[in-house]
A protein has these predicted regions:
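Acidic, Mg2+-coordinating phosphoryl-transfer loop and its flanking beta/alpha structural elements
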Residues: 146-188
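Short, acidic loop-to-helix structural element flanking the phosphoryl-transfer center
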Residues: 62-95, 103-112
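Active-site neighborhood of HAD-like aspartate-dependent phosphohydrolases
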Residues: 6-62
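Short cysteine-rich clusters marking metal-coordination/redox-active sites
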Residues: 3
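Substrate-recognition "cap/lid" segment bordering the active-site pocket of phosphatases
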Residues: 100-145, 152-157
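Structural recognition of alpha->loop->beta junctions
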Residues: 111-126, 178-199
Length: 199
């Protein structure tokens, strides 16, 4: 799509979450918590706060962040190929995260290193608890063709800002057969959206 005023090519935007979407944060953090606590948490990794009291949970999460564990989080299969493919299709890729950039000095270096190690291609990174509100102030919301996110509450925010059609939930939708089940399938879904944008 070209701008009618300046003739400049306007690229479609794809927003990709990191933790739980491109990287296997949940099981990685759970494994860390087992070692940090010296025992398994009271509940599985998919239960809020692992069943721990809030003080203990926050202390554990802070230790995870300060210990550079974000660098060693496993990448989900196909995340690197997904970003390379989206880039080849002309998408502008925004990596979005709620990681607390301003509170911990190592968050940006650890994030950048994780992206580098896994060859994740991107144009911009947003660190913000309100990451999708931030994105909506930086790009025209109409340019956002896809938001790939694992957390339902973040999906709800993105839907309000970018419309129902733009949001793709990384988990749970596939159980109801309403969304792809893995990143490779997500790639083809998002590629089709980019194709529609370009038409």
């Amino acid at each position: 799509v070209q701008c009618t005023d300046c003739g400049k090519f306007i690229r479609p935007v794809v927003a990709l979450d990191i933790d739980g979407t491109m990287g296997d944060y949940h099981s990685h953090f759970y494994e860390f918590a087992c070692h940090w606590l010296g025992k398994s948490p009271p509940t599985p990794f998919y239960i809020d706060n692992l069943g721990l009291d809030l003080h203990t949970y926050r202390a554990c999460k802070l230790a995870y962040r300060q210990g550079g564990m974000k660098r060693t989080m496993p990448m989900y299969y196909f995340a690197d190929t997904l970003t390379a493919g989206l880039r080849k299709l002309g998408a502008e890729i925004w990596v979005t995260t709620t990681r607390p950039y301003n509170r911990l000095d190592n968050i940006d270096p650890d994030t950048q290193e994780w992206l580098r190690r896994h060859d994740i291609q991107y144009d911009y990174v947003i660190y913000d608890p309100d990451k999708y509100e931030n994105l909506a102030t930086q790009v025209d919301p109409g340019r956002v063709v896809a938001v790939l996110e694992d957390l339902p509450e973040q999906c709800d925010v993105a839907r309000k800002l970018f419309g129902d059609g733009a949001v793709v939930q990384r988990y749970n939708g596939w159980v109801l057969e309403t969304a792809p089940s893995n990143l490779e399938e997500h790639f083809y879904d998002i590629a089709a959206r980019i194709g529609e944008w370009n038409d």
